UniProtKB/Swiss-Prot annotation:
Low complexity bias: start-end ranges: 147-159
Stretches assigned to the SSB domain: 5-111
Name of the molecule in the record: Single-stranded DNA-binding protein
Motif placement: Important for interaction with partner proteins: 163-168
Species assigned in the record: Brucella suis biovar 1 (strain 1330)
InterPro entries (UniProt xref): NA-bd_OB-fold (IPR012340), Primosome_PriB/ssb (IPR000424), ssDNA-bd (IPR011344)
Region (Disordered): 113-168
Keyword Acetylation on entry: no
One of the record's GO molecular function terms: single-stranded DNA binding
Gene3D superfamilies associated with the record: Nucleic acid-binding proteins
Amino acid sequence: MAGSVNKVILVGNLGADPEIRRLNSGDMVANLRIATSESWRDRQTGERKDRTEWHSVVIFNENLAKVAEQYLKKGAKVYIEGALQTRKWQDQNGNDRYSTEIVLQKFRGELQMLDSRSEGGEGRSFGGGGNRNQMSDYSGGGGDFGSSGPSSGSSGGFSRDLDDEIPF
């Protein structure tokens, strides 16, 4: 068993369009602001209360950054899986500042669009794991948080003429 686990899963809405930039190395990076909300009733007053948390997400996986740039817009509902990282930086006055972010590294992390406007309202899942040569993984089912398998060519999914016969 591993000594520790650093895994963050969020389901929320984008507060703004993704911010896309390039590092000095030429690698594409996407920055997202995701809102997660919870609501409850106050036991004493019966009043409905809401609280929204804002999360900074940084995508270093070039393929996932391209997906974010092309498909994600303000208000989009997404599933994000990454790791929590805190970085130290200095402001204009030389004071140390800290930022905690959910980071999707080159070969780790997942991004799924939950309210895709594609045919049939299906969500799309894009994973960054493994050493596959395919650009991204596609999951045709909106409720599946995992990956169904590598995409085949430009079709973006599995062939529709699969044999309907179950092999067992």
